Amino acid sequence: MARVTVEDCIDKVDNRFELVLLAGHRARQISQGAQVTVDRDNDKNPVVALREIAEETLSPADLKEDLIHSLQKHVEVDEPEMANEFLSHSGEAETVFATTSEEESCSFDCMSEEDLLAGIEGLVIPEKSDDY
């Protein structure tokens, strides 16, 4: 059996460092029970992974995509935007995005200074305790 070298794989994967990452990822997949695409010939998983890359039984682009996906902690999912649905129904969009009147949206900004002072004066001071 001929030994698998980096030169056998370098024409499939341009960068040697990327080749090591891809072969290591594939070797881990084989260790976890993935189907081997070449004859094992009593070789260890890293050698089998390099042989698979050299014989092009696996696509390096697919391996790279799978490696990136396995390293991601947060996977983004493309979801259709809800705004398009609202814009398509213009009558419904106006009712959904309708603004409220100023009286309903009035908050602390609309309180007068006298109302604030009356509220502060109405507060009860807690009794002093031994906690502090």
From Swiss-Prot:
Promotes RNA polymerase assembly. Latches the N- and C-terminal regions of the beta' subunit thereby facilitating its interaction with the beta and alpha subunits. It comes from Bartonella quintana (strain Toulouse). This is DNA-directed RNA polymerase subunit omega. Keywords: DNA-directed RNA polymerase, Nucleotidyltransferase, Transcription, Transferase. Belongs to the RNA polymerase subunit omega family. It catalyses: RNA(n) + a ribonucleoside 5'-triphosphate = RNA(n+1) + diphosphate. Coiled coil: none annotated. It is an enzyme of class 2 (transferase). One of its GO terms (cellular component) is DNA-directed RNA polymerase complex. Its EC number is 2.7.7.6. It comes from the Bacteria. One of its GO terms (molecular function) is DNA-directed RNA polymerase activity. InterPro entries: DNA-dir_RNA_pol_omega, Pol_omega/Rpo6/RPB6, RPB6/omega-like_sf. Gene3D superfamilies: 3.90.940.10. It holds the Pfam family RNA_pol_Rpb6. The RNAP catalytic core consists of 2 alpha, 1 beta, 1 beta' and 1 omega subunit. When a sigma factor is associated with the core the holoenzyme is formed, which can initiate transcription. GO terms for biological process: DNA-templated transcription.
